[in-house]
Amino acid sequence: MGMEVPRASSPAVHNVMVANKSTNTGPELIVRRLLRTAGFPGYRLHWRIDEDGGRYICRPDISFPGRKVAVFVHGCFWHRCPKCNMDIPKSNVDYWSKKFEKNVERDRKKESSLRGIGWRVHTIWECELDDGASQLVEILKE
């Protein structure tokens, strides 16, 4: 069972929360454009990856199945970028603390599971889009 989502503190907060997207975010679109420009158009979006036994692992933002490369484009706020050290919202602190802990733990599990079946995992943080995408291009050139 999931956590109970608290009521938004105002209609404006509600509208902001409803507008948050989980796929095809601005940072994802930037990375995809950089990959196409660099000559790497053959990726899959939100491609399901299973273990050999069929157990579901995850759907990375971008995958190169033939190369076994999984790419996650993480927003600094939602995935708790270690460099940005974003503040936790002041209202509903318990809820947000638990949510962020679960997000970070889920990210760790995905990465560990993918590496366990031979995938290379590359995480690009929102605050480092250009550098992260450039590093990814170098990995793909190998």
Residue ranges and their predicted role:
Residues 1-142:
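Nucleic-acid endo/exonuclease domains
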